[in-house]
Amino acid sequence: MANPDETCPFCTIASTYAPYPPTSPPPPTSSLLSPDLTAPETHLILSTPDVVAFLDIMPLSPAHLLLCPRPHAQKLSDVPPAPAEALGRYLPVVSRALVRVLGEGTDWNVVQNNGVGAGQVVGHVHFHVIPRLKDRGAAGGPMEERFRKSFAMFGKGPREELGDEEGREMAALLRGAVAEVLQQEAKL
């Protein structure tokens, strides 16, 4: 990996987990996917030579995942060409995988912040892919609902730590769905 930042949690993930063929991911019990190689656990979805995807440790909803380039880049304008191309390639793939796992009719946001002033918390480019579940209603009226949706869209709102067992199960489902999506694309 080019220019890893030893203090960056996403560089740690990118340097810990080796790439594997996304059409045939290792079994969940494989040491290649061991979530406890990092602390907190990493629930890997995808690991290619250029990008990694994993579940957010403080998800806004089930299956909230992050897709990031393997090399360290603080802002989208800093991402080298090959990882940038891979980000564009795999955003639709992980989106389709998410729909396969959560069901047709699932809505989702794709959010990417550039810099602290834009709300970026980890200084390594990453795209949030956030499913929007239909049963997350607001306690109040239309204004509260509008405010809640606006807040949640930009990564704020109710968040809980991802449970390790829940993370392992969801990551396995999403890895399988990514493989299915890519296998289906290969037939087209």
Tell where the protein language model's regions lie, with residue ranges.
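A short glycine-rich, hydrophobically flanked beta-strand micro-motif that places a catalytic Asp/Glu
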Residues: 102-118
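Long, well-ordered alpha-helical scaffolding segments within enzyme catalytic domains
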Residues: 82-101, 164-173
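Active-site microenvironments that recognize anionic phosphate/pyrophosphate groups
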Residues: 1-71, 168, 172-188
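Histidine-centered divalent-metal-coordination microenvironment in nucleic-acid enzymes
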Residues: 115-138
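Short connector loops at helix/strand junctions that flank enzyme active sites
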Residues: 46-48, 60-62, 82, 89-91, ...
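A short, aromatic/hydrophobic, helix- or strand-capping loop or linear motif
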Residues: 22, 38, 101-107
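Short histidine-centered catalytic/ligand-binding loop motif
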Residues: 65-88, 154-163
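Conserved His + Asp/Glu catalytic blocks
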Residues: 2-7, 132-188
